[in-house]
Amino acid sequence: LFGLSNYGFQGAQVFYNAILPELAPRRRLGRISGYGVAAGYAGAFIGILLVGPFVEGAVPGLGLRIPGVRAGGRASAFLPTAIFFLLFALPLLLRYRPPGPSSGDSSRGPSLPGWRAIAADVRRSLLDTRRYPGVRSFLLANLFFVDAVHTVIVFAALYAEKVMGFPDSVKIPFFLVATVAAGLGSLVAGRLVDRMGPLRTLRWVMAGWIVCLALLTASPNQAAFWLAGCLMGALLGCVWTTSRPLLAVLTPRGEHGRFFGLFALSNKAAAILGPLLWGTVVSLFEGLGPFRYRLATSSLVLLILMGFFFLRGVSEPSSAPGEAPGA
């Protein structure tokens, strides 16, 4: 059941991202994307407050007990999470009206394709990236630099413990502060996207990640680590805010669903190379003690540089394919 629910959640992200170009004109895509990302990080806090009483019997951090609600352990979090997920999704499900089909017979409802048809459609979508300049290069760039970002997220707690000596009591406040920074960073990035363009903003964000990885690797004390963590949290929000508008302007209206599907595939594939590189460095330099974690973190710069390499093949068009300039 957990695997099925996770499949549904990940699949919903494709449609959620593809809706973005339908909600706002190009000049406001960044701002709307930033609002969505910031709301997601705010939801992380709200979710803890709403579901926490079912797990611990009280509101986390506040100790407030809700009459009739008893602590049920971690397993008791799933049902209320599903209910709240549905409730928060209802405004979009009820108010959003997708544009009508541009052609074809609309009298028949949509049919569910078989697995062979799905595989053929994925293959066709990959081939179609050649028709739209920059799409394939962007997806490859996204694969590498998001790989570095995902790896930092996965191993941040281990790095904080092994290198900086953070106890568990400090880890949670640290990640909460980084989450707040991510929400604020997404709002700032949204305005920068609308002012500078998504491609230029993304390049600055990637450069910022290189600087932050260097700062993280060289952090001499916990204060410097806190600074690096807050900056990386802000840049994390920037990554998700800038990537979606860039893909939206690179692909034609009416085809966003297919290409955001490839975008999601690229993001999921980005969970392979980075952890493998990080783990290999840690294993090879085992004799260096905690310093090996610094080396492993610094090696992630190579992935971001690969992202820069492929991003050279991307040029931001004056208008999306099939869209009138200035729309």
Predicted regions and their residues:
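A membrane-interface helix-boundary motif in multi-pass transporters
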Residues: P53-I83, T280-I304
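Multi-pass alpha-helical transporter architecture, strongest
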Residues: F84-R95, S298-A327
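Intracellular juxtamembrane helix-capping segments at the cytosolic ends
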Residues: G11-A24, C238-P252
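Helix-to-loop junctions at the C-terminal end of transmembrane segments
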Residues: L184-P198, V282
